[in-house]
Amino acid sequence: MRKLTPMMQQYMEIKNQYKDALMFFRLGDFYELFFDDAETASRELEITLTARDCGLESKAPMCGVPYHAANGYIDKLVSKGYKVAICEQVEDPSVAKGIVKRDVVRVITPGTLIDTNLLEDKKNNYLVSLYMSSLGCGFSYVDISTGELLSTEIVGTSIEQNLIDEISKIEPNELIYFVEEEDKIGTNFIEGIRKKLNIHISKYDPWTFEESYAMNQIKNQFNILTVESLGFSLNHLGINATGALIHYLKSTQKRTLSHINKINIYTFTEKMVLDISTRRNLELTETIRGKNKKGSLLWILDKTQTAMGGRMIRKWIEEPLLNIQNINRRLEAVATLKNDILLRCELKESLKQIYDLERLSGKIAFGSATPRDLVALKKSVAFLPDIKKLFENENSGLLKELLNNIDTLEDIQALIESSILDEPSISLKDGGIIKEGYNDELDELYVAAREGKHWIAKLEQAEKDRTGIKSLKVGYNKIFGYYIEITKSNLHLAPENYIRKQTLANCERYITPELKELEDKILGAEEKSIAIEYEQFIEIRNMLLHEIERIQRTARAVAELDVLYSFAEAASENNYVKPTVNSSETIDIKEGRHPVVEKVLENNMFISNDTYINTEDEQLLMITGPNMAGKSTYMRQVALIILMAQIGSFVPATSATIGITDRIFTRVGANDDLSQGQSTFMVEMSEMATIVNLATKKSLLIVDEIGRGTSTFDGLSIAWSTAEYICQSLGSRTLFSTHYHELTKLSETYRGIKNYKVLVKEDKEDVIFLHKVVKGNADRSYGIQVAKLAGLPAAIITRASHILSDLERESIQKEQYIIESTAENTLTASTDVANEKQLKLDDFIESEIVKDLKKINLLETTPMDALNILYQLQKKVAEI
């Protein structure tokens, strides 16, 4: 029976350890892939699939790429979601006995990329570790390119919702997980995430999530005795997730992770909570249509000059603060920068010269930093003293704190300046890295190399004089070394001591003993100098390993300063004002504007509006008006102004007082989720269920046209009861827009509900939208006028007008009945219920509705399912 060849046996032994990865197997100057890996790679990379004799009866499928061009191919595979294991020759083939030893030196995955050419400068590349048990969830994530590591645990209610919010917020490229077998909810959740999000998800070894093992991984990484010293509490589920994450990184990267030297353990009470719907509807970092940065809040506020600042401003926008003191510290810093245009300009000029210090430190830690990376580091730190000098008179506050955290790193600059050429070679293997004067032995070799060129020129001239051949020249190539070249027409003049080396079409090439002696001296010096340069560079890079924490601390301070500069620049450019943020429950905005819409409108055409909301007599603003009048823009504008204030930004208004807001909820638009089997109405109800279950008195609710996804009477009923529930049970500050003009009657019953409308000017049969929100209620929807503006044919418009008149006459009595009936049966009308005849349960025991209720398992029913069940029961009741 035929067996695999020794080399293929070696391949299979290594491949079996990395079954989930495509293995790039180093053979000389190529990386080769075999069997299934080869078929996958040839298809994905569009390269030729061949075959190789492997010792078996049939040949092994094979494809390969040159090692010097492998990065491009690897990057393409990783971007498609594949893992790639790099298997290198780990001993010199010239001294190997038998098969050259090989081993995997790194596994590259979507979440462990460090190649800056593949990473977005202003966006993190996160890898998530998820541990789900019956007790809750441990959630940790890392950006290996910067060393940032965070962890939390999610317990209690709304675990799945909080997880979805966190995952969608950080947008990881890879997720590893373990779900305890008995935790069915967790398994279903993972499958849902796999379907919805475009990330690489893989189940990881369960034993790496075990608490004792995970704890040891954390202790070893941070060189500590107890995990409590990092901030973990006993039995914190984040321990399981973090330990497994560290194990995964070490097992794939095959090296120490010295740049991961701190961990941020956070809770959900530190920042404003923004769920996935709110972030999408407010278009915080990208637009709903097109998924573009342009048109988002980030587009307006991002004036950052550094890559680190660009990543940080994205985080700030998605994580507004709840601590009033910290908010005001940011606002004071922004005010200082906004009020001093000269300071701001000088700061900008310094910031724009600074490279990505976070990712440079990551490359140093990984041992992948090139000579040019070190030059970029040197150039960056050269501007740090200038930044510190700008704020030398700053005595307190956030700016002073940041400047204290900026280390000028002058010793690092001096080291690189004295050792690395200003324009070094790209490759470590070609020399051209180390400056003269840094190493004595290298200096001697440099002299020999320079003298060697002079020796060659001198020999060439001597041979021309001796032979009389004016066209004679001395050349060099890597195969033959140095040679003397004589054209065919002068061959008869070649001396006898010339030794023929190569014959070409038009010339002959020779060597001489003297030339060979010179070659040995010159090439020996060059080869030795290249080897020493490489050793010296590695030594310098290793010296910088000990300074990574200093570089990272400085990078974080520079990034934060960059974001504050960005806020100040945006405030100055767009005429924003400093908001007042306090602990009250009042929102008072004068002449507020939508930060994005005003930017895209020409000639300052945006109409500003006031907003006043509290939790007492102006708690729910019932807003009516036609489509296109600006209701949605107005409501989003209020939400964005609150959010901007709580990230420490100035706001688009003439004044703004913001009572701290713990969550912003939005029920905006009709976003069908048909791929998940959810209709417009179901999505609407699910989002509303989330709001009523999680909102507090400190929350802001944006409710836009609830109930329009179903029939008129169903929709009106749901909108009516929802408004009542918000007003009575939640007490949340709410902007509630509707086309159901009947809802304006609620202001007569509830003190906290106030009616507002968007002004419209009628011009004969046309309508002009004034976009001004004032007290009162609209009496018409102007739907036909809007249809006319949209360009519907005149015949349709005329016919619609006739139908509308008929319908209005028929429904006026029915609508009056609904209004009177509903007003008499509000949630507060409990006295009516008490006076009704007491009914017995036996009267209904055999009804279909009671049978349906018996079937419901409350322990396994999610809020969304419950709302859907309630909706179905309501329909059955309506049919009785």
Swiss-Prot record:
GO terms for molecular function: ATP binding; ATP-dependent DNA damage sensor activity; damaged DNA binding; mismatched DNA binding. Disulfide bonds: none annotated. GO terms for cellular component: cytosol. It comes from the Bacteria. ATP binds at residues 625-632. Keywords: ATP-binding, DNA damage, DNA repair, DNA-binding, Nucleotide-binding. One of its GO terms (biological process) is mismatch repair. This protein is involved in the repair of mismatches in DNA. It is possible that it carries out the mismatch recognition step. This protein has a weak ATPase activity. Belongs to the DNA mismatch repair MutS family. This is DNA mismatch repair protein MutS. It comes from Alkaliphilus oremlandii (strain OhILAs). The lineage of its organism: Bacteria, Bacillati, Bacillota, Clostridia, Peptostreptococcales.
